[in-house]
Amino acid sequence: KKLGIAVVMSLHELDLAMKVSDRIACVDGTCISKIGTPEEIFSGDYVQKLYGIEQETFHPLTGEIFLRSKKEFPKVFVIGGAGVGLPVYYRLQREETPFAAGILFENDVEMGAARALASQVISVPAFHPMDEKALEGAKKVLDQCERAICPLQEFGPLNEANRALRDYARAKGILCEDN
């Protein structure tokens, strides 16, 4: 902008286009179907419709695209949050191991990936404490799993239920201590 130069790029990485573009022109086949700012293009479900992708596989706030996984009965319960569960989700997806994720806040950075990749997600509303109902629901799912993984290292007043869930998995003998 400062030099008065326009740069035209052809980007297929939506998250990169979202971060570096002032304006985006979307091509649908051989025609430009929409031109706008990243905020205009990526809000709503336009991108999902343009590319024919399912709602859960694209996160409009981050531009992330997730490969869909099979929604089978979970074998592993991942006790995550604050992003630490993401590498575990991706590994389990590569291994084609169905998993459950929880307890997550609805606004957690992991929610997009969890909704797309996990067979089941146990969550609570954003900015609300994890209540006994969520903990009991998570325990019921965990009881059906072969193992549990807890990459969380820190617990606080709002996610204390995840510590209880980790301890519950440990007492059942299914917690993988090495992740």
Residue ranges and their predicted role:
Residues A25, G29-E40:
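Conserved switch/coupling elements of ABC/ABC-like ATPase nucleotide-binding domains
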Residues Y51-E132, C150-P151, G156-N159, E177-D178:
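ABC ATPase nucleotide-binding domains
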Residues K1-L3:
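Helical segment within the ABC ATPase nucleotide-binding domain
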Residues E160-L175:
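A short, gly/pro- and small-residue-rich
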Residues A17-K19:
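A short, surface-exposed alpha-helical micro-motif characterized by mixed small hydrophobic
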Residues L11-H12:
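H-loop/switch region of ABC-family ATPase nucleotide-binding domains
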